[in-house]
Amino acid sequence: MSAQNSTDPMGATNPENGGATATDLKGKGRAPAAQEPVEDTSMAEDDDDDDDEEDPEEEPEAADDDNMEEIDLDNVIGRRTRGKVIDFANAAQENPADDDDEEDDDDFVEDDNKMDDSKMDED
């Protein structure tokens, strides 16, 4: 037999793919190998040089942002409701709930027949 026409079920090499085995190229869940990206290190070196020059400029700006002014105690609000006992029965009597929702429901008229007639006309 010739070498080109023979098949080796255990993983024959394929001369067209640089000697890669057939199992490397085919199979469930196997994607073709992609070329690895080449990193450009020349830009990274330039960035390092720029960072050294910018560091002294940033330090004085940080000192200007400190505004340590006194806090006006009139603007501080106390403990409003923490620790207070609320009598909900008394609060309900003083502030009755609005019954507007129930009154609005009486005004609503549903037009079921009108919608059914329009559907029959379309057919």
UniProtKB/Swiss-Prot annotation:
Q: Where in the cell is it found?
A: Nucleus
Which Pfam families does this chain map to?
A: CHZ (PF09649)
The entry's keywords:
Chaperone, Nucleus
- Region entry Disordered, spans: 1-123
Q: Which GO terms describe its cellular component?
A: nucleus
Acidic residues bias: start-end ranges: 37-73, 96-110
| Tagged with keyword Cell inner membrane | no
Kindly indicate whether the keyword Chaperone belongs to this entry. yes
Which SMART domains does this UniProt record tie to the protein? Answer: CHZ
Locate the transmembrane regions by residue number.
none
Q: Where is the composition biased (Basic and acidic residues)?
A: 111-123
Self-association state and partner proteins as the record states: Forms a heterotrimer with H2A.Z-H2B, stabilizing the association of the histone dimer. Also, with a lower affinity, forms a heterotrimer with H2A-H2B.
Give the function comment from the record.
Answer: Forms a chaperone-bound H2A.Z-H2B complex that acts as a source for SWR1 complex-dependent H2A to H2A.Z histone replacement in chromatin.
The family note in this entry says:
Belongs to the CHZ1 family.
Q: Which protein, by its recorded name, is this?
A: Histone H2A.Z-specific chaperone CHZ1
Q: State the species of origin.
A: Chaetomium globosum (strain ATCC 6205 / CBS 148.51 / DSM 1962 / NBRC 6347 / NRRL 1970) (Soil fungus)
The gene name reads CHZ1
